[in-house]
């Protein structure tokens, strides 16, 4: 644990966008910066924000008879306190993370990360900001903003055809494909990119920065200089190093074609239209209150869906417990009836009508054997 920093900056950076859009390579570019620490994809903070919202509802449900509302703890403060704790934990343990990275990943996962990112850089404990490149956070930007009000988001966007081809050819470190088919790949791109574009409109260019994948590949230095200007950080030439080596490559064959006849044509058309629009139109110059309200409504809807799902799960668990108890009781009854049947059969054999016939027949045969005349010699 690193407790050397008296004041810990709470300005994390989230790299969002569709999977296979360059989120990994951009994240590791940022990790070369002397003030930025790359953390492994976390994947839990989005759902954590939703769970916090549910807990806040519970903690304020009875007005002044509930602790949070009785103590005038506002929702924004509730979220931000937890976010600050997460930030402090990450920064206080940055030295431990870099120590573990000093060699194991480069050997265990070839080509997964640039080697420069796996070594302990001088002054690592002075890195005051952390970077998370979890693509799924494209769908959780509103909740992450509540946890980390000072967070900045980089939306890296790539044309949909390239993403779909890459997704269909990518095996996630031996864990299988990201999607089952082409239809899911188009839908995944559409959902994540649409969510990021809504965040661009909702929060404006001071919070969300759009970076085209093509710009990162074709003019990397210019692209990173613009990006660091957005992040209010000085440009660091070492951040270009990871771009010299392909990482997390899906190794798409040149002759690989997309165009599955089972894929919904209207979905493909919608994705293609949005992809062209993103490539040709600039990012909105300012935040939109209407889009922000839309983000908030979507977040609240998700909270409601989670609450309903939890209620259904709780009801199913109670039903399962009740059925298990009923089954246990019926098994006991069956065992009792089987035991009674065995006792009944035993009594009937020993004392019943059948047993009398059996015993009388035996005695008659015995008496008859004594009455038979003996043969005279």
Q: Can you say where each PLM-predicted feature lies in the sequence?
A:
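A conserved segment at the C-terminal end of the G1
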Residues: 24-36
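ATP-binding Walker
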Residues: 21
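Short gly/pro/ser/thr-enriched loop/turn and capping motifs at secondary-structure boundaries
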Residues: 44-47, 161-164, 242-244
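P-loop (Walker A) phosphate-binding loop of NTP-binding proteins
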Residues: 18
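PAPS-dependent sulfotransferases, especially Golgi type II membrane carbohydrate sulfotransferases
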Residues: 1-13, 200-201, 229-376
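PAPS-dependent sulfotransferase catalytic domain
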Residues: 51-62, 111, 117-238, 252-261
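PAPS-dependent sulfation machinery
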Residues: 37-138, 173-174, 267-271, 277-287
